[in-house]
Amino acid sequence: MSSLVRLKFNAIKLVIDFGISENIAYLISIFLPIVLLLVISVLGVLVTVWLERKISAAVQQRIGPEYAGSLGIMQAIVDGVKLLIKEDIIPAQGDRWLFSIGPVLVVTPVILSYLVVPFGKNIILSDIRLGIFFWIVISSITPLGLLIAGYASNNKYSLLGGLRAAAQSISYEIPLTLCVLSISLLSNTLSTSDIVEQQCKYGILSWNIWRQPVGFITFFIASLAECERLPFDLPEAEEELVAGYQTEYSGIKFGIFYVASYLNLLVSSLFAVVLYLGGWNFPIPTTLIFFISMYKVSLPLDSSNLLLELIIPIIHISITLAKTYLFIFFAILARWTLPRIRIDQLLDLGWKFLLPMAVGNLLLTASFQLTLFEFS
């Protein structure tokens, strides 16, 4: 029994011990991971926003937020509360229903993507065998939400921003998918957990970044474009389109777009870690034999096993998040150091450079796998 299944079983048993019926306890066990996922996602966004403000301040030789909490850590929460209490304005000539459903279609696929992200060994909400395929399919819904948001606003800037967002997402989703398929072909699996497991044998030397360097570079650039980060933030270029498809949005709906942007950056970084940087695996190959024997000297067997069950998941999650925020650091650094490119340059980069690179990388990976199959 995995640690996650055991934790769920113990939680149900604990709720039943408090006098709650089994049916209600089972419902709680179903919805609790969903609530936990939402809370963790929001916390991840708050940390990412704070990091971006501090890093951008350092790049521009400023101090950044410092008064709202220690080191300005509460500034993102204050801004979020401010957005929640602002008036939600709907354009008089716009489509009210589509205007409201646009942000939902943008943020929902991003949140659902976290279901198949392994934060540690057996620490995953839904370990389906088609995890990579699920992420690719669910992320393809986001451009539809952006296009609907731009169309429903009945504003020329919003419509142009929505069209740009859809064109950009389609252009860069294809090379991104081909890079993911190369990793899947190399690992002979579509499961995110299995992909990480295959990168643990020799430590950092087993990571897929060494076997797929071209794929990693292509994935990094395409993921930045998918997240609409500078230098690829053409759909909301202030000098050209005011705020793009977000122009007519305010209050909580604008906040949903804002949160979705950072959630997308976070989930893209997590998948980069899972696919290329070994996931929860430590860079140096280690074994737990010495760790277990050290604690067995002074602790009973049950106590040492219980301690390991508590410590190992924490270590796995910490390693995954450390790699993720390292990836986010470079994404933030790119935003504040590179100039915005033109829309024609954006599409040329996607179709004329990244797509051929991704196709060539996939063909080389397939040839390599066929050669190994012939000699095995």
From Swiss-Prot:
Keywords: Chloroplast, Membrane, NAD, NADP, Plastid, Plastoquinone, Quinone, Thylakoid, Translocase, Transmembrane, Transmembrane helix. It is an enzyme of class 7 (translocase). It is found in: Plastid, Chloroplast thylakoid membrane. It is a multi-pass membrane protein. One of its GO terms (biological process) is photosynthesis, light reaction. Its EC number is 7.1.1.-. Pfam families: NADHdh. PROSITE patterns: COMPLEX1_ND1_1 (PS00667), COMPLEX1_ND1_2 (PS00668). The chain crosses the membrane at residues 27-47, 65-85, 97-117, 130-150, 166-186, 251-271, 272-292, 310-330, 353-373. This is NAD(P)H-quinone oxidoreductase subunit 1, chloroplastic. GO terms for cellular component: chloroplast thylakoid membrane. Belongs to the complex I subunit 1 family. It catalyses: a plastoquinone + NADH + (n+1) H(+)(in) = a plastoquinol + NAD(+) + n H(+)(out); a plastoquinone + NADPH + (n+1) H(+)(in) = a plastoquinol + NADP(+) + n H(+)(out). HAMAP family: NDH1_NuoH. One of its GO terms (molecular function) is NADH dehydrogenase activity. NDH is composed of at least 16 different subunits, 5 of which are encoded in the nucleus. It comes from the Eukaryota. PANTHER family: NADH DEHYDROGENASE SUBUNIT 1, NADH-UBIQUINONE OXIDOREDUCTASE CHAIN 1. InterPro entries: NADH_UbQ_OxRdtase_su1/FPO, NADH_UbQ_OxRdtase_su1_CS. NDH shuttles electrons from NAD(P)H:plastoquinone, via FMN and iron-sulfur (Fe-S) centers, to quinones in the photosynthetic chain and possibly in a chloroplast respiratory chain. The immediate electron acceptor for the enzyme in this species is believed to be plastoquinone. Couples the redox reaction to proton translocation, and thus conserves the redox energy in a proton gradient. The gene is ndhA.
